Amino acid sequence: MTSSQDACYISLLGLAEYFRTSSPPNIKKCIQCLQALFTFKPPLKVEARTHLQLGQILMAYTKNTDLARNHLEQAWMLSENINNFDDVKFDTASLLAQLYQQQEQSSLAKPVLRKAIELSQHNVYWHCKLLFQLAQTHATDKEYALASELLAVGVESTDETNATYLKTLFLLSRAMIMMIERKTGDVLTILNQAGTMIDNAVQNIHLKEYLKVFFYVLQVCHYLQLGQVKTVKTSLKQLQQSIQTIMAPNWPADEQIFGQSNTEMFMWLPKEQLYVLVYLVTVSHSMMAGYMDKAQKYTEKALTQIEKLKSQENKPILAVFQIILLEHIIMCRLVMGNKSLAIKEIALAKDVCLSSSNKFLLKKHSAQLHCLLGLYAMSASYFEHAERQFFACINDTTERDLKLFANLNLAIVYLRMKREQELRQILDQVQQENSQCSNSQALMGSFYYVQGLNAFHKSSFHEAKRFLRETLKMANAEDLNRLTSCSLVLLSHVFLSIGNSKESMNMVTPAMQLASKIPDIHVQLWGSAILKDLHRMLKEPALETEAYNNHCNFSQNLIADQMKCTKFPEHTLISWVQGDPPLPMLSQEILEAPPAATIQQQSATVVRLSGQPGQQVIYQ
């Protein structure tokens, strides 16, 4: 460029920046200034950089993604083969790949990222950033083996530069992918390797603490995935201690910590989001352990924190956290007999999913929404609706635990509908699948419970006792309180049915104690009915009257709540089984409530551990 062209170029750049930073920004004039640069036929480097700048501006300030894409594609084509032009070249590749993904064209993003990775081997920062991004792209497309391979390449590439922090980040990210793949043995091996590095090799105390949080989140999720609620307690306490350290007032800002060197600029999640995530895994643990009050308390705190963060900057990951928290709190409401709140929150979860970019969350969570609607319909004795919702869930998901959970609840629906052939098919299918792969201890305990419930309904009392003792053994080993209370109350009913009042009382008493602690209104309803019969058999009229009054109170509360929720427009969501959920629902006909007499004692359902948090984020 001549000196006069140089001056024009600098002036136009200055003007563009002036218009961009004006209050309010004048993006149209900013873009016009940048486009005017092309009239001077600038050198390739200047042309490529200008196309990148236009792409950045268009993506950040406008909805004209097609024009942004055009500029970024030109920037990539021009810069791809220019030496000593790393920032423009790799920034372009990264941004273009992001845009392709936004347009749901990850097949175009992958070759761009692969080429950029190949060209960036001399630049540790960009090489690692692009490896993370491509791994994330494959993980989003559920190509977990490819994502894992790329993260393994990242581990190897950091060996050459002795970047210990970055190596640990790659290891933990790979462990996360393997958790999704259910490679239990490999997860433990990698977590142990990463844990040793965090303790002995990472010198920076601030980076060490962030890695600890990442490590403990994965460890806690791993144990919860296996249904090991008791085993996880130590790791959960350590996680809570680490997050308290990071959130302390004297802890430096993220910007001060992640910027000391190129290999330390990578962050899994900022501390405010980690804070929400720790609440989330604590809620998950409380749910599985059967502490609904605790789960509710932590959910409310987490949702408050999410709203606070949204008011500052509405990051997509916050909606992911919100939807998983809502999934948990909805199950709490159903266990506690509060269907009217549950259906309102299901509708809220649906709205959160619909409001996400390109309905991304709806695609990820439609199966969970159907499952929650199935549980809601089941608890309200709308069994045909529950059946359709569980089928929709099973057809929508590839997640093994969610399929198993939906099938177990579907089995209870068939049991209540006296459809023995379909029930037998489900139980045989679950049995066959369980022989081929390991499942969550909580879910397998639930499977034995459903078999025990089935045997009880067939009056096969000896077989029912055998299944329920197996359930109790698994539940007691890991402090699965809700599973324990459900099993004890059913076992009590078994003993009552064979006339063994002493053993029946020995079972129902701890069942009621646990149920009031959870609290689980369905077990309390069932247990109070058993106690009424037991006290009548034992000729204890005062205690019989007390048990009868308790039973009436539980029953009336459930009936009143059901009458209330069936009048809500949100109740019609139980008819949604395919496509996008309806919006709005106010004009839709409200389904009539079934007779109150259909609320039966054996309405206990199984509680699901929701999809594990953090799986959607490898690098941000």
UniProtKB/Swiss-Prot annotation:
Component of the cohesin loading complex. InterPro entries: MAU2 (IPR019440), TPR-like_helical_dom_sf (IPR011990). GO terms for biological process: cell division; chromosome segregation; maintenance of mitotic sister chromatid cohesion. Transmembrane segments: none annotated. It comes from Aedes aegypti. It is found in: Nucleus, Nucleoplasm. It holds the Pfam family Cohesin_load. GO terms for cellular component: chromatin; nucleoplasm; nucleus; SMC loading complex. Belongs to the SCC4/mau-2 family. TPR repeats lie at residues 90-123, 445-478, 485-518. PANTHER family: MAU2 CHROMATID COHESION FACTOR HOMOLOG. Required for association of the cohesin complex with chromatin during interphase. Plays a role in sister chromatid cohesion and normal progression through prometaphase. The lineage of its organism: Eukaryota, Metazoa, Ecdysozoa, Arthropoda, Hexapoda. Keywords: Cell cycle, Cell division, Chromosome partition, Mitosis, Nucleus, Repeat, TPR repeat. It comes from the Eukaryota. The keyword Nucleus applies. The keyword Metal-binding does not apply. This is MAU2 chromatid cohesion factor homolog.
